[in-house]
Amino acid sequence: MQWLELSVTVDTEAVESVSELFAQYGYNGGVAVEEAIIPSLDSPEYQIDTNKPVIVRTYLLANEQAADAQTQIERGLWVLGMMRPVGDLQVKTIAEEDWANAWKEHYRTRRIGQRFVIVPSWLEYEPAENDVVLNLDPGMAFGTGLHPTTQLCLELMELIEFNNTTVLDLGCGSGILAVGAAKLGSQRVLALDTDPIAVEATAENARINHAETLVTALEGSLGDAPLEHWLGWEGAQLGTPQSYRHHNEFDVILANILAKVHVVLGNDYLAALKPGGVLITSGIINEREADVVAAFDAVGLEQVERRTQGDWVAFTHRKPV
């Protein structure tokens, strides 16, 4: 049996979109994101060189379905290329005996913030004091765990108290935030996503991190709004994921999703939080920041923290007591 390695070089702001495209067609939704690094001369630590392009990879079984999947990926890249610089799709054939190591070589241990360390599950890592280690398997867009929107969330999470809290991770993706909350001391985490692949990935990553009794991953959304607000075009049909309605239930809500979704869910965030509860939001492009700020101000959420990285903004808000 043979495999096809598909790769494309993009700028940092296109990584998440290309990763989501590759996850739709790649084997088991697996995506590898290879960022340029600046190694340290004195330690195994390194920094990401954000000024250099990023390589995004996925893999296909070389069977009769591969040609159609490759065509769909090429079409998707063409559309994305209308908005951001996207390189040509590169395709390489890999023999079965080389497959096991071909995809693993593009993953490495990565420190985010002061405490979080993301470690591919097959690598060994000796944690330092106060490290919070997240062992993750590649699944739906694993590489987006390194995306600025996720980094901002993890950094903001380090600033609040999680011991004995009840947490909602909305749009859980790979489950990195849900598992992070559990590792920081949360007693119960509900992880919701409208994509069943994301729900499976979150459940698996919770298991790998021995957090399966703390993290519950379900397919669904939050509140009363129509579910089409989750996608980037109007009138999209998402099938029938359940819409969950919670009142004064969560100490913390984590939501790394589209800015337009944050705008729609302002009232639902407020309703779901306990008095004094904390909302961390990311996935907000600079151009949509004012919309999100206005929506949250309108419902009475109090801004506590604002952070930026590149073109992205993240917030911490609090529900009044």
From Swiss-Prot:
SUPFAM superfamilies the UniProt entry points to: S-adenosyl-L-methionine-dependent methyltransferases
Main localisation: cytoplasm
Classification via InterPro entries: Ribosomal_L11_MeTrfase_PrmA, Ribosomal_PrmA_MeTrfase, SAM-dependent_MTases_sf
Segments traversing the membrane: none
Cysteines joined through disulfide linkages: none
Entry EC no(s): 2.1.1.-
This protein's GO CC annotations: cytoplasm
Enzyme class name: transferase
Catalyzed reaction equations: L-lysyl-[protein] + 3 S-adenosyl-L-methionine = N(6),N(6),N(6)-trimethyl-L-lysyl-[protein] + 3 S-adenosyl-L-homocysteine + 3 H(+)
Keywords on record: Cytoplasm, Methyltransferase, S-adenosyl-L-methionine, Transferase
Binding site for S-adenosyl-L-methionine: T150, G171, D193, N256
Compartment(s) of residence: Cytoplasm
One BP annotation, GO: methylation
Pfam families reported for this sequence: PrmA
CDD domains: AdoMet_MTases (cd02440)
Leader peptide range in chain numbering: none
Gene Ontology MF terms: protein-lysine N-methyltransferase activity
Function: Methylates ribosomal protein L11.
Alphabetized PANTHER family for the sequence: ELECTRON TRANSFER FLAVOPROTEIN BETA SUBUNIT LYSINE METHYLTRANSFERASE
Homology family: Belongs to the methyltransferase superfamily. PrmA family.
Protein name (record): Ribosomal protein L11 methyltransferase
UniProt source species: Herpetosiphon aurantiacus (strain ATCC 23779 / DSM 785 / 114-95)
